[in-house]
Amino acid sequence: MEAIAQEIQKLHANTDEAGRGKINHDLSVLLASFDTDWEKILKLAAGPLRLALVKVGVDQGIFHALNERSHTLPELIEKTGVAPYLLERILRGQASFGMIKEEGAKGFAANRFTTLLAGPNTSGAVTYIFDILRPIASAIPGFLSERNNPAITSTHDTVFQRAFNTELGGFEWMTGHPEHYGNLFQFLALRPNCEWVDAFPIEAEIGSFTNDPHVEKVLLVDVGGGTGAQSVAFRKKLPHVKGRVIVQEIAETLIHVGAKAPAGIEFMEYDCFTPQPIRGAKFYYLRYVMHLWQDERCVEALKVIITAMGPESRLIIDEAVIPDRDVPWQAACQSILMTAALAGAERTLTEWHNLLDAAGLKILNIFPYDLNMQSVIIAVPK
């Protein structure tokens, strides 16, 4: 078995991202085939507990403590204040799920997963998963059972309202609970840095757009760009290309930028359903925006951008383009949650063509760039 494991590790280390994804998938299928029916049921039962143990480890500082050094059970009891008999069971459970590792009879230490769970953004990410995503997922069965027509057509009539006992839409509710915005941004910050700017020939697209030395044009308008991470990636990719880079966001999000605004990036308060003040920019960039809404709302926002585009402008949509079958689990989960929480959706290639056509746009090219079907879609007005 050790020789087999070493061979798999060697293959995993020496292949590209697509190859690693296939290895991971094939191994998951193989391992699942070994489970008995009862083991499959037990794993379902363990799912909620696994998340709860992660939350406990974050809240009680267990992962941080072990990431600094190994601890004995008495040391962790003193550090956390949790009752000895309960903490010992929690630690054993965390070790059984691979969150930490056991050392000797009563000792515990960090592993790779512990280090991740002790990371700077993980606390907010885990809290967001536990406080927001978990209740939404739990409310889906009841939502479907109670409705004769379970179609979700409005942001005010989704699983979110049932999960949080509110009549407000998801983002309206979040505005009244700003701590969750901060947790959301920490969650999103953990995504792998597969850079959209490396996915297509971006300098060829810019061409001679910025050649006029007397005019500083706008290179990028990052619509709904959060705290500017993608604009920073754009600047790093093209430090030698002059031109303004502007992030547009709602006020509730800009609060989280504050004095930490990245150098060379402008921030502007903006609602994407109001007239676009930046006209004739080279790129109007939307990342994880269209999947928040159903088609009608997307068309409305896209038409606003079209009115601001010049003859050299390009619309860039950075989102998943999912296949009609064999969808990766990551994209499938995200699609379900977007629909359940916000009446949004991840879209197939056909759905993207139909959506952009309805808005008055045509797709010039699509560049996939990761295993979750994340893609750069380049479009222009018809």
Swiss-Prot record:
Disruption phenotype: Abolishes the production of okaramine B and leads to the accumulation of 3-desmethyl okaramine B. GO terms for biological process: methylation; secondary metabolite biosynthetic process. SUPFAM superfamilies: S-adenosyl-L-methionine-dependent methyltransferases, Winged helix' DNA-binding domain. It is an enzyme of class 2 (transferase). The keyword Chaperone does not apply. It catalyses: 3-desmethyl okaramine B + S-adenosyl-L-methionine = okaramine B + S-adenosyl-L-homocysteine + H(+). One of its GO terms (molecular function) is O-methyltransferase activity. S-adenosyl-L-methionine binds at E249, R287. CDD domains: AdoMet_MTases. O-methyltransferase; part of the gene cluster that mediates the biosynthesis of okaramine B, a prenylated indole alkaloid that possesses an unusual octacyclic ring system, including a four-membered azetidine ring and an eight-membered azocine ring, and that exhibits insecticidal activity against silkworm larvae. Within the pathway, okaF catalyzes the last step which is the methylation of 3-desmethyl okaramine B to produce okaramine B. With okaG, OkaF is also able to produce okaramine D from okaramine E. This is O-methyltransferase okaF. It comes from Penicillium ochrochloron.
